[in-house]
């Protein structure tokens, strides 16, 4: 049976490719390995659940694309806002890599995507939710 560690390793491997790593100015991380003080464009992979003891195994993973906020002047006031254009271009590449991936015996689909604010670190991130359906041990 697979474990969430296996899912994290699979997604990490799919995204640790030059088309991604040379496009961002940060790194690809697993779990809580991302430095707390990172100000880079980083991608973080984590899995939140995976059934055990029976097939098919059903699970959920996240791919979080972090992008530092960008200063913008709105109505004469300087503010930090999401850099949506950069988030979109990185997310496009991540989704493209995920969609073209073939992992024998495993099936995953991109279930949803949303943008979330991390105001404490002055960054926004795109959360890409992945659903797994694993038919083999």
Model-derived features: positions:
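Short acidic low-complexity segments
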Residues: 27-39
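A short, hydrophobic beta-strand-centered structural micro-motif
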Residues: 38-47
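Charged, amphipathic alpha-helical segments and their flanking helix caps
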Residues: 1-24, 47-137
């Amino acid at each position: 049976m697979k474990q969430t560690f296996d899912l994290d390793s699979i997604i990490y491997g799919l995204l640790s490719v030059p088309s991604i790593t040379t496009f961002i100015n940060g790194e690809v991380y697993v779990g809580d390995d991302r430095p707390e003080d990172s100000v880079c464009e980083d991608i973080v992979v984590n899995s939140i659940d995976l059934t055990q003891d029976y097939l098919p195994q059903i699970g959920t993973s996240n791919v979080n694309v972090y992008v530092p906020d960008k200063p913008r002047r709105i109505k004469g006031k300087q503010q930090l806002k999401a850099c949506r254009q950069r988030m979109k271009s990185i997310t496009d590449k991540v989704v493209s890599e995920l969609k073209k991936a073939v992992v024998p015996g495993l099936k995953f689909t991109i279930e949803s995507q949303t943008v979330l604010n991390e105001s404490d670190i002055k960054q926004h991130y795109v959360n890409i939710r992945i659903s797994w359906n694993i038919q083999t041990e």
